[in-house]
Amino acid sequence: MPGFGTTEATQKNATQLMQCLGLTIETIDIRESCFRMFQDLKHRPFGLSLEGKTWRSLQAEMEQLPDDKRNDLVFENVQARMRTTLLMNKGFVIGTGDLSESALGWSTYNADHMSMYNVNCSVPKTLVQFLVRYVAMNRFDGDVRKILLEIADTPISPELLPLSKNKAMHQSTEGTIGPYELHDFFLYHFVRCGAAPSKILYLAKQAKFHNEYTAEEIATVLRTFLKRFFAAQFKRSCVPDGPKVGTVSLSPRGDWRMPSDADPTAWLSDQ
């Protein structure tokens, strides 16, 4: 379901992987339907008028946007929800969201946040990448192995913001919220061990993260983690079923109960 931010590389890898695995391929371009939604909402993407335009002319205009003008949450959410709408109207939706995204609220509410069953709900992002590489090297060979390794090495991005004129991607998840290897480390010690932020910072130093990041960078990412973890509870209070894998789970029905209006101030002051 290509949208305004879909890159040629990710679309190619998805298509080729399905071909190699013998799956049926069905492509639905969501740009026209999203454009009509913008019109219905009277929304001006990135402040651009839609009068007398088509989605193609809008895309051409968005390619010229400077980097500091490529921010529009409604533009992103419409695309994410359009994909979920199409999927749910056609069949049983298997969720793709993982534990890290759930912890950080890195999803669109009632879009990729929702499904009929979420198989990765307790698998952190770093483990997802490890498993893709493991399967590539131990279960497949040839083209499938090559494609899976390319997917694992692809910069993490929702690809919802418009591409530049040279079709380059301008949206990096880790560039926005920080490295997932730090977030997953924080998540484990915060939820599984109940560690205070000050102890988590100490443990991060013992884990040698200071070889890759400065103490200030680690502390900044931890603050981001805490703020987003508390702010995202309302999303975790409404999630589909899924299996528990490992020792950390954020299911509101089993392992994690938390009020959606909890205040992170006490935790933030402990750094």
Task: Briefly describe each language-model feature range.
Residues 1-271:
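ATP/NTP-dependent adenylation/nucleotidyl-transfer catalytic domains that generate, transfer
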